């Protein structure tokens, strides 16, 4: 494996990501389970050690925290979410065909994106989407109460837990973050620090909070450089962690090697997969994603599972058990047009083993 997966090979794989016209800079980190393979590089306008927004990869950190809180008997995944919120805030968040299903929604429904609750960020409205405002320079915070207020004006996608139904919704993770804060009595950024950042000595990883902090590299939306400090500071559980590819790798390896929860719990996370088609095409389980890798991509040798999480910013963190290879980094393009560059690099490396 090591003879082919060398410095030149990895550098070429990273450079190839820049051939996507939407990608202006990228970071790629690849490691094997035993670290006999370990490569880190930056191309374009991003350096290997740069901090970047990991965006929705943050949700994998939420999964880890929830599993640890469950192990402490602080909560169960079958808990009804209305138990954690004031009635005036949560009531009416899921009204479908005149029936309020709010009290049927569980933590599992949120964690698996099967609640049916609309996504406040991407949902079409006459006045446009929150994401549209953001990329056109209208940076504004979206705290939980504001997100819920918008969601209550929208029609749910389906009943909570309806068989075969799934809808990717950032609202679900806003709610999960609030539940974590309720259980611990702490801001979720401090919970991340206590449960993950400090135990693993992650000195370049933190929950974005200071809107004057310009340390993270700016994201791009198509050719436009965007900075949205107010928004990023308001969505900690949904996508507000800042990290580096190297430190995201430390977390990823810990996640899949039983450092946060027994390795057997991975079976629970992978028990039920549903295909999501927006904001990308991939499978979603219980707080975890799996890349869509049809056999036609590798007819002679199946790719196998590629598990982890995408971020809308182009951040990624994935693990392929078959080759025991881990991948972290970012293509730093929030339009969705650059994700294929990272996907192709990951698949190419796996196929080369």
Language-model segment annotations:
Residues 1-42, 49-53, 83, 164-165, ...:
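Catalytic loop of the DD-peptidase/beta-lactamase superfamily, centered on the K-T-G motif
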Residues 1-22, 109-141, 270:
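Extended low-complexity intrinsically disordered regions
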Residues 19-25, 44-109, 159-169, 236-239, ...:
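Short active-site loop at a secondary-structure junction
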């Amino acid at each position: 494996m090591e003879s082919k997966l060398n410095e030149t090979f990895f550098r070429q794989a990273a450079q190839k990501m820049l051939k996507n016209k939407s990608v202006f800079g990228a970071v790629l980190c690849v490691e094997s389970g035993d670290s006999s393979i370990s490569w880190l590089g930056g191309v374009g306008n991003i350096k290997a050690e740069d901090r970047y927004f990991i965006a929705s990869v943050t949700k994998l950190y939420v999964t880890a925290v929830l599993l640890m809180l469950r192990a402490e008997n602080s909560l169960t995944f079958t808990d009804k979410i209305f138990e954690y919120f004031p009635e005036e805030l949560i009531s009416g968040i899921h009204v479908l065909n005149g029936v309020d299903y709010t009290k049927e929604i569980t933590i599992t429904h949120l964690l698996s994106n099967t609640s049916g609750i609309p996504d406040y960020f991407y949902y079409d409205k006459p006045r446009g989407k929150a994401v549209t405002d953001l990329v056109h320079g209208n940076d504004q915070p979206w705290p939980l109460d504001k997100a819920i207020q918008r969601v209550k004006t929208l029609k749910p996608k389906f009943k909570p837990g309806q068989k075969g139904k799934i809808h990717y919704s950032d609202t679900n993770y806003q709610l999960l973050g609030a539940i974590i804060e309720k259980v611990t009595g702490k801001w979720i950024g401090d919970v991340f620090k206590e449960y993950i950042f400090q135990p693993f000595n992650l000195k370049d990883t933190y929950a974005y909070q200071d809107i004057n902090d310009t340390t993270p590299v700016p994201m791009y939306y198509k050719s436009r450089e965007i900075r949205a400090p107010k928004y990023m500071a308001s969505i900690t559980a949904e996508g507000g962690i800042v990290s580096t590819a190297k430190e995201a790798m430390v977390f990823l390896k810990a996640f899949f090697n039983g450092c946060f929860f027994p390795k057997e719990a991975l079976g629970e996370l992978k028990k039920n997969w549903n295909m999501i088609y927006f904001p990308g095409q991939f499978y979603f389980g219980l707080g975890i994603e799996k890349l869509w890798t049809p056999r036609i991509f590798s007819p002679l040798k199946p790719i196998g599972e590629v598990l982890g999480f995408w971020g809308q910013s182009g951040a990624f963190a994935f693990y392929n058990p078959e080759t025991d290879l881990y991948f972290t980094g970012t293509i730093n393009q929030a339009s969705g047009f650059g994700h294929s560059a990272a996907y192709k690099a990951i698949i190419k490396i796996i196929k080369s083993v």
